[in-house]
């Protein structure tokens, strides 16, 4: 069983096993836990993978990662995929054109890729907790929150569930469907707080609470341990490796790729956790060419991956039609820095970002990053045009996936004949007003009206009952607080 290592060095905290890192994701010096070693997937192993089901592949990769989870626990966790649209496989790989395949990661209960990790994650945390009381914090730009709440609701984990969840979301920073998915969750172990601020504020608050001695002491006085469900938690990231491997193996199995060809993977990126899974897959030996980060107008990742400079000093967060990517401080870049440059350099960069609002890689370091990554970005006007263009071709996109189509169009010209997979991170129905406007509806439709408009244009589309039901449920969580009052609001709830 491997130990997890720490991105900013060991400090006074020993490296821990995977289970301990899942339950307590707070590493030394404000850093993150990550894998100390990665297995090598030989061509022979990858060929064996081609004949596995998705669940079998997950179990095999976790076994090779040597994470120390029992076969019974993993089987129990992976049963959550049985409730996805197709119980045989939780994802779908759709052909978009001759060179592009769309990996649909949104067929779970909250219609976003976060279900791929967070549905099994809930059962794993519940089991590893061994009946101890835990508080799970989650900050969301719109998709992580609903997926976490769905996973940890008592109806999923049972009435004797010892885990409570507090979800922080930016009051005006999500789609209406995303908000309704959170504020209608009626389970006594769940608390949803809107904050007056943006996702970066929510994520900073979460990280601060993980390190807050007064807050941790208050929880300990009540016998409560503290954890988090964001991709600061390595347990999330582990599951996000699997579908990148699966996509490659399926394309080889179906004869689309020869085993000597590499595959380029495009990922709409905000907090960098999804594309990080692809990075680890490439490090493990999967023949991935470039990992292409697709951003919206908040294009700090584009700037970083093309110049080596991460600079937030003069940036204002812009509200876009792809709100799950409205992020400026991208947490998981830190794990890439560690993997490529080690703990000392990572610690220097993160300290510089905190103290000066920026850090810069030298030319050699930038070259190392660009061995793995490329980048593109897309503004809202381009996004609308691409939604309309794709719809005319017979494929309905959400705005985040549309940013990925822009990346494909940018790079397919340069990489003629190479194959691409685009990770589609959310179903269109979560962002229906923006999709409807792109397809000719008037601006300002409410979500339900916009959904009806889109369905009227495409009779083949069916609305997921998971989305339909949020419009009928009563709102349970009304509280909105200033950032400075989040800690007190949580403590009051737990009293």
Identify what each model region corresponds to:
Residues 1-495:
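PLP-dependent amino-acid enzyme catalytic core
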